[in-house]
Amino acid sequence: MNHVPSDQSFYIESEDEDDRKDYVEEDGGSHSDSSDDVYDENQAHIKPSSYTTAWPQSYRQSIDLYSSVPSPGIGFLGNNSMTRFGSSFLSSGLIRRHTPESLPTVTKPLLEEQADEQALPKHRLSSQGLLSPIPSRRGSMRKDEKSSMVSHEIPMSRNSSYGQAVLNGLNVLCGVGILSTPYAAKEGGWLGLMILFVYGLLSFYTGILLRYCLDSESDLETYPDIGQAAFGTTGRIFVSIVLYLELYACCVEYIILESDNLSSLYPNAALSIGGFQLDARHLFALLTTLAVLPTVWLRDLSVLSYISAGGVIASVLVVLCLFWIGLVDEVGIHSKGTTLNLSTLPVAIGLYGYCYSGHAVFPNIYTSMAKPSQYPAVLLTCFGICTLMYAGVAVMGYTMFGESTQSQFTLNLPQDLIATKIAVWTTVVNPFTKYALTISPVAMSLEELIPSRHIRSHWYAIGIRTLLVFSTLLVGLAIPFFGLVMSLIGSLLTMLVTLILPPACFLSIVRRKVTPTQMMLCVLIIIVGAISSVIGSYSALSKIVEKLTN
C-alpha cells in the first residue's frame, strides 16, 4: 500500500520492498511461481478494506490477546493509547469510515492489514470438495516478519508455529466446561455421552468451514469479518453481539464458580455490613469482583495473558487430581449410573455444547499461523485432546459420585484430601487471570462507541469496565446456578457460534460453488444446531425459573 503516513492518518504505509523480500514459499506443492507474479501485480492495487472500518474494529486485537501469549508490558488506562478506539460510530452508521478528527492520533489500522494477504488471489476456494487442497493465506508466512503493535499495545504476531497454535486452541477450549462434564453425564446418562462426540465432530467440521470462508477473500481475518462478507453490516453486528454476549456470560460463570468453590472451602464465612448479612456465597462473590476489578483496569493485559496460558496446565492438573482421588484414594460410590435420562437430557445438550465454544478464536489462530496449511491438523489435535479429556472426566466423575454429582465436580471432592485442596485452589486461581482477558473484548467494543470528544478521558473507559464487572456480579448473584447457566450459554450462544453461523456463512459466501453434498451437510448441521439450541435453551430457562420461584 503506497500510502504516506501522517499524524492524522488512519492507515500506515506498508513496507512493500521488505514484504517482497520476506515473501517466501513454505508450501512448495501448494503454490507455483505464478503466485509471486500475482503478488507483484496486485501490490499497486492494495487498498484499505471496508472490514477495518465497521464496528467492532477492536475485535482482532482483543481476541488475539485473549487467546495467545504476547510480549509482556503493563500499564493502566490513563495512557493515551487506551483512547484510540473511541469514536462516534453511530453518527453516520456503523460502517462510516473514520475521519482524522475522530481518530486524531491513530497511525495504524485498527485491524492490522498485511500486504501479502491483500495480494492473495481471489480464487482460493475450491469447488471440488470441502476438504480439497486450497492455496493458503500468505500474510503470515514471512519468515522474518516483525510483531507489529497496535492500539492497547497488543502484539499482532503472524508467525505462530504449529505448537503455538495448538496451545492457543487448547487454552480456549480447555476451560471451566470440563468441571461440568460429570454433571452432564448425570443429566443425560451414559448414552448421552454420544452427544459430546457428535458435537466434537461437527464443531471440528465447522471450524474447517471458517477457514474456507476466510480464504474466499484476502482481507477477511476475524469472525465478524466473515459475518459481514456473508450478510453485510447487519451480519457483522449480529455475529459480534453474539460473540460478546458469550464472553460476557463466561465472566458471569467465573463469578459463580469462585463463589461456589470458595464457599465450599469456608462455609461459615459471613460478613455484616450496615445491617446487611452476607453469607459465604454472597461474600466470596463480592470479594472476587473486587479482586478482579483492578486487573480489568489494566491497559495492557499481556502479563495476565502469559499467566492465563497456564490454563491448559491448570485443567490437566485438576483432571489428574480427580483421577488420583478416584483411583488411588478410592473415593466415591462407584455408581453404575443411568443409561439414558430423557427428562434432563436437554440440559446435557447445552453443557456438552459449551465444551466446544472456541470458534470465536479460530479465525484469529488461522490468520496468525506461519503455515496456514497446518490449520486442519491444529484443529484435529485440539478437538481430539479436549474431547478425550472431557469424556474421561465425565466417565470418572459420574462413576465416582453417581446421582449426587454436582454442577462442578470439585464440589463433590472430600475436603480433607490434599489432592482436593490442589484441585479446588487451582480452580479458584485460574479465573482470576482469565476474567480480565475475557471481559476486555466486550469493554473495548463499547469504548469504540464513546463520542470522539470524550475519547481522551480515560475515566470513561474505567467507568465502562467497572460497570461491566459489577453487572456480572449482579447477574451471578441473581442466577447462581453454575450448571444451568452453562447449559443456557451452550444452547443459546455456543450453538449459534459453533454449529449454525459457520455453515450459514459458508453457504452465503460460496453460493453457487457449493456442491450438493456440501449443501446437504451444511443444512444438516444448521438443523442439528437449531434444534439443539431451542430444546436446550428452553430446558435451561425453565429450570432456572423453577429454581428461582422455589
Curated annotation (Swiss-Prot):
It is a multi-pass membrane protein. GO terms for cellular component: membrane; plant-type vacuole. Residues 1-44, 128-148 are annotated as: Disordered. The keyword Transport applies. It comes from the Eukaryota. Its main location: membrane. Residues 1-11 have a biased composition (Polar residues). It is found in: Membrane. Keywords: Amino-acid transport, Membrane, Transmembrane, Transmembrane helix, Transport. Belongs to the amino acid/polyamine transporter 2 family. Amino acid/auxin permease (AAAP) (TC 2.A.18.5) subfamily. This is Amino acid transporter AVT1C. The lineage of its organism: Eukaryota, Viridiplantae, Streptophyta, Embryophyta, Tracheophyta.
